[in-house]
Amino acid sequence: MPEAGAIRPDGTVLGFDVGSRRIGVAVGSALGAGARAVAVINVHANGPDWVALDRVHKQWRPDGLVVGDPLTLDDKDQPARKRAHAFARQLRERYALPVVLIDERSSSVEAAQRFARERADGRKRRRDAEALDAMAAAVIVERWLAAPDQATLLP
């Protein structure tokens, strides 16, 4: 039986790669074919574009939310981690869904490598580079799908 507040293992999730200027968003499900990049949300001086986030939430109706936890390579805290945790708390309050944190170390590097491969194969163009944040979010969702027990439930 899943832990109270945990995301259903067969549920649909939205994943987030939180940055200071943009937030990548992806959707995934254990019943589907992994994860898919779906949006890049702008972050303004007063915070993320909640209207755009509300639209994505309404479109996908997730059972839970997965936020990348940006630890340093030596497991230390950093400003990006505080920002990601604050965003995760805002998501939980706004949507009343379970929110988990998953280690996102090297997710942006992995997304950049995928983008480079897809570009070399002719499936992506240079102008598609903005979608890199959403591709990083897809990596985060795939990590959760592969090992949901490695996620930390947002306290």
Curated annotation (Swiss-Prot):
Family statement drawn from the similarity comment of this UniProt entry: Belongs to the YqgF nuclease family.
One CC-aspect GO term: cytosol
GO biological process: rRNA 5'-end processing
Enzyme class per UniProt: hydrolase
Location(s), subcellular: Cytoplasm
Protein name: Putative pre-16S rRNA nuclease
Keywords: Cytoplasm, Hydrolase, Nuclease, Ribosome biogenesis
Keyword Hydrolase among UniProt keywords: yes
Lineage top rank: taxon: Bacteria
InterPro entries in the record: RNaseH-like_sf, YqgF, YqgF/RNaseH-like_dom, YqgF/RNaseH-like_dom_sf
SMART domains cross-referenced by the UniProt entry: YqgFc
EC identifiers of the protein: 3.1.-.-
SS bond list: none
Protein's job: Could be a nuclease involved in processing of the 5'-end of pre-16S rRNA.
UniProt keyword Zinc present: no
Listed Pfam families: RuvX
Species of the source: Xanthomonas axonopodis pv. citri (strain 306)
GO molecular function, one term: nuclease activity
